[in-house]
Amino acid sequence: MYYYLITLAVIALDQLTKWIVVQNMEIGQKIEVIPGFLYWTSYRNDGAAWSILEGHMWFFYLITVVVIGIIIYIMQKYAKGKRLFSISLAFILGGAIGNFIDRVLHQEVVDFVQTVWGNYYFPIFNVADAALSVGVVLMLVYVFVDDRKTKGIK
């Protein structure tokens, strides 16, 4: 059940950082954190990652509720005793709920983390997005390690 604590921590950190941005920054305002690389940039997104399907909130409500239900079911049924698997699901669940809260309460998601690599500006994201990404990477590691164990590869 420790993985639900991870989920709650992700949600709390996500909502706290978004609240700080909303309270202290104007939309479009940019604060340089690491020169030439990391900025806090206040942005609102009414779509999915990278503004995909902007303006289709009903779709995100439906998909998110279904995904959250599936993740909780999988956590209860299959994740017990599988540490990396349960942690990856906890990050994914926390990220999904964090952005869902924004969509329900504000019909948009607060994004603020902007990274720059040379001339490339990575799409602005938030803690929930980062948690989703970390969860997916951990899930891929779990699948790779589990596959190697199943095949007896060291």
From Swiss-Prot:
Tell me the GO molecular function terms.
Answer: aspartic-type endopeptidase activity
UniProt catalytic activity: Release of signal peptides from bacterial membrane prolipoproteins. Hydrolyzes -Xaa-Yaa-Zaa-|-(S,diacylglyceryl)Cys-, in which Xaa is hydrophobic (preferably Leu), and Yaa (Ala or Ser) and Zaa (Gly or Ala) have small, neutral side chains
Transmembrane regions:
55-75, 84-104, 124-144
Superkingdom assignment: Bacteria
Question: Part of which pathway?
Answer: Protein modification; lipoprotein biosynthesis (signal peptide cleavage)
Q: Which UniProt keywords apply?
A: Aspartyl protease, Cell membrane, Hydrolase, Membrane, Protease, Transmembrane, Transmembrane helix
**Major location (coarse):** membrane
Q: What is its EC number?
A: 3.4.23.36
What are the GO cellular component annotations? plasma membrane
Keyword Transmembrane helix carried by entry: yes
The record's section on Pfam families has: Peptidase_A8
Where is this protein localized, as stated in its record?
A: Cell membrane
Task: State the similarity comment.
Answer: Belongs to the peptidase A8 family.
Quote the function comment for this protein: This protein specifically catalyzes the removal of signal peptides from prolipoproteins.
Q: Which HAMAP family does the UniProt entry name for this protein?
A: LspA (MF_00161)
- State the name under which the record lists this protein: Lipoprotein signal peptidase
Gene responsible for this protein: lspA
